[in-house]
Amino acid sequence: MLRRLLSTAALCALFLASVPVAQRVGAQATTACPQGLRKLDIGISVSPPNVVHTSPYVAKALGYFAKHCVDANIVEFNGGTVGTIVAAIQQGTAIGNLTDISIARGLKARQIWQLAPRPPQAYVVSADIKSAKDLKGKRLSAAGGGVGGFNWLMGREVLKTAKLGVDDAQFIAGDTAGRLPGLVAGQVDGVVLHPEDAHLALQQKPGTHVLVALSQLLPDFAFNAYGASEELIAKDPGLLRDVVASLIEADRTIYRDKARVIPIMVEATHKPRESVEYAYDVLTKNCIWAVNSGFNPKRTMWTYEHDIANGDLDASARKLTYDTIVDTSIAKEALKLVGGEQTINSCKD
């Protein structure tokens, strides 16, 4: 009898070990969430995501969304902060990357959590480009939105360091997935690449090199903030609080448990493990992911004022303050659910 009981216990243990974490936590959430799981779309700026964008994938795979009674549907958009992702936020069906530019142009929405307070990317160029002045007459990437998209904006910033303007180079539009292949194939001479893609570029095309890191080029630039419509914030702040709490837990796990999150990141990004691990090390070392709300008023307002100075917002645009860009209440309430503010390896945003 004892032997049969032990065998049964062993089989149960083996069964539990074989069930994915998210599935086990999801089953537990069924009883812990009397009203069921609440649905919300989580918009990702690019398809497939870069390593920096994988926090929602970690939150889902490790069961943090289910723990907070959220049924998160991750939706990948091809085009950064333009087009469909902005429309989804406006409709109140999703949260996603939201810029001050969209708000100033009339979108009734506010940022609720900063995924990545500072930019993780570098401007990567072909072998014959030795300095920014060599970009004159070259083909530069405008992937993910064309004119006004992130690659175009950052290309403009690099050109400015050599007293050049956007008319001094040829910008090539395309899908975000084509950023790395375009550089490797010689279709463009300069492009913004995330660390994992920069790692691959240097391997696949000898002589390719980093011209400048964006965090050095624009040290006060606020990179990626999740936003929600004002209607959704007013209608269901509890849902947004729980989503943000899930994401904060995911980011903290990213910093603390590399072995646990790397497989999730590899699956989400479709990138080689070696390149994902390289990116992970760069991102964690430089405190790219938020461990708390991610917000810093200085960064937010510098970015807004920079957009005005560059003409990205004209006189007709709505005038903004920090409080009209950011709703701080959601992240404040979320932090109460995850033990308050923390510092991990000197990272404290």
What are these regions (language model features)?
Residues T8-P20:
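Bacterial N-terminal signal peptides
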Residues H53, V82, V86, A132, ...:
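Extracytoplasmic/secreted envelope proteins and their assembly/folding machinery
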Residues V19-Q28:
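Signal peptide processing junction and immediate N-terminal pro/mature segment
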Residues G178-H270:
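Pocket-lining segment of extracytoplasmic ligand-binding domains
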Residues I308-D349:
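Conserved C-terminal helix/tail region of periplasmic/extracytoplasmic solute-binding proteins
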Residues K235-A315:
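Secondary-structure end/capping motifs
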Residues Q28-D175, L180-G182, D189-P195, L211-D220, ...:
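Short, glycine-/small- and polar/acidic-enriched structural segments
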Residues M1-R4:
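Positively charged n-region of N-terminal signal peptides that target proteins for export
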